[in-house]
Amino acid sequence: MKILYEGADIYPDVSVHRCYHDMYAEKQSDELLLKLNDTRELWDSWNPKKGDTIAIEDGAAKTGKMFVESVVPESGIITLRAYSVPQSAKDKRSKSWEKVKFLQLAQEIAGRHGLTLETYGITDQTYDYVEQNNLADFAFFQNRCTLEGAAFLVYDGKLVVYDEAYMESQQPVDTITITPANDFEYRDEGANAYGSAEAVNGGLTGTFAAPNGGDKMLRRILPFRMTDQSEADRFAKGLLRDANKNATVGTLWTGSLLRDYAAGSAVTLATEGVKSWDGTAFISRIRHDYVKTRSKLYLRKPLEGY
C-alpha cells in the first residue's frame, strides 16, 4: 500500500488506523477518510494544508488524485478528509450562454477546474439559452445532466460525463455470486415509482411515459424557458429517470478488496436467495476499506426502456 502525499510515499512513516475511499457514480464527490496514528509526531513537520494532493494505491485499487479538505489532530490520531474535486468547485458564479452545446458547458467547467473531459454515450444537444445563476459549477452542471438523463463523476483529474442508460447497458465487468452467508441487503420500492412525468414552463409541457408504467405522475415546473417540444419531452424523460432509478437498490459487503471495480460500471449478480436480483446491477457507489481489505457495493437495478 502507498499513501502518496504531494507525490511522496509517507506510508512507511505512519501507522494507518482507518482508510475508507468512497467512489460515487453521480451527484457527489469521491471522498477519502484517513485516520493515522502519528506516534512519531511527524505529521505536523510535514506542514499539511488544505488543497494538498493525496492518493492511495493498493495494487490495481487507486483513489486517483484527491484534494485535502481538512486535517484534524487529536490524541495522537490524525483524521484527514480529501475529495476528488478541487477547492475551486465551491465557488459560486453567474453566467449565461446562447446557442450553446451540452459538451461545450462540460468542457468549459472541466477547464476551469483543471480537469480533462471524458464522455461516454453522450448526445451533444444544443440549447437556445442557458443561465447559471449564483450556483457552483458542478451543482449547475448536475441540474443539466439530470434533465438529459446523464451523470458525471470526477476521478483522478478527469471530469467523466456519461449517459446513464448507455452505461447501464454496457457489458458487466464481472459476475458476483451471492449466497445466504453474504452480507446483502436490498430494498424494492418499484410499486411507488412514477409512471410518467411532465416538465412545464410557460406554454410548453413536456411529457414522457415509462414503458409498463403505472398511473402515478411526476410534475415539475422548470424555472427556465425550454427551446421546443422535443426538448421539453426529453427533459420530462430525464426527470422521470432521476426520480425512479433508485426504486430497487441493494448493498453488499465483500470478503476482499475489489481492486478492479469502480462506481459507474455494471456487474452481473447471481443470487441463491433473491432470484429477482439475478442479472445486471449498476454500481452507484463503492467503498473500499483499505485497512480491512474489503469493499461495499451500493447497487441499483437498471431502468428498462429509458
What do these predicted ranges mean?
Residues M1-Y5, N47, V154-D156, D163-V291:
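Acidic, small/polar-enriched beta strand-loop surface segments
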Residues L34, S94-L117, Q132-D156, A199, ...:
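Amphipathic, non-transmembrane alpha-helical segments in extracytoplasmic/periplasmic proteins
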Residues K95-V100, L299-Y306:
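Glycine- and charge-enriched low-complexity intrinsically disordered segments
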Residues M1-S88, A181:
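Assembly/oligomerization scaffold segments
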